[in-house]
A protein has these predicted regions:
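Basic nucleic-acid-binding interfaces
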Residues: 1-88
Length: 88
């Protein structure tokens, strides 16, 4: 599963042809969660408060780019790297 963004130790990944709603897979220090792109809310799993806040802000700030990657993933096309909250 490609890493589409990495910031502050948070890995953001996306599967090709994954189930709806549009979401990202987030890993941080042994915690895993599915996070809705539209809202930044955790829809499955759990993250520490700080990581949850950072990923929510990232989803809301970068919303167009993860949605574009979601559409590429559904079409089984290569995904684009998205800048992290630390602007990497």
């Amino acid at each position: 599963m490609p890493v589409i963004s990495y910031f502050f130790g948070i890995y953001v990944r996306m599967y090709n042809d994954d189930h709806a709603p549009p979401h990202v897979h987030v890993e941080y220090q042994g915690h895993e969660a599915l996070v809705a792109i539209a809202s930044g809310d955790i829809i499955e799993g759990a993250l520490p408060r700080r990581a949850a806040r950072l990923i929510k802000e990232w989803c809301l700030d970068q919303q167009a780019a993860p949605i574009e990657d979601w559409q590429l993933a559904q079409a089984l096309l290569p995904l684009k790297r998205i800048p992290g909250a630390d602007n990497d």
